[in-house]
Amino acid sequence: SLDKLVHSFSFDLNSRFGNNMSNQFLATYTSIKDMRGTNSDIFPFIDIMGGYDAATGVQDMTPYMSLGYELFTYNNGVNNKILTINDNFTYNLGAHKLMAGLSFEYQMANNSYMRNGTGYYRYRSLDDFLTGAEPEAIAFTIGYNGQTNPSAQVRFNQYGLYLQDEWNINKN
């Protein structure tokens, strides 16, 4: 399953000061939580392959059976938070329309992914699995410094200050 929660809010204030001045203040906030989920219990993923021919040394890589927690779902998710604020002041001077403004943007992205987070075991054959033979391949993903749900997080801020002159040369 893919649990996607999106929350978004905005605030817009438009003000007039006489006939030739106005201001717009706009703020928005968005939070996106996109977690991949499953109804499985945490259990290693096991691949049992189609068999191994000891005489020729050839491994049949066709999966005979696979079971366990899906390899790409454990601790797989993205969280984003975005805040934007804009404030624009406009002054009309006949042929010139001046606008001065400030802007601010904050973004945070948090991404987590742990392939093989519950462990992975691959057996050459059903017989190897049933007799307790050593797996042919094993994989574990362990978070840095022992973290159980590691993630990469990126944050940044962007500021802006601007002045614009909209000039109508001809009267229409």
Give residue ranges: language-model regions:
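Extracellular/periplasmic metallocenter environments
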Residues: W167
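Loop/turn elements at helix/coil->beta-strand transitions in domains of secreted/extracellular proteins
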Residues: H96, K171-N172
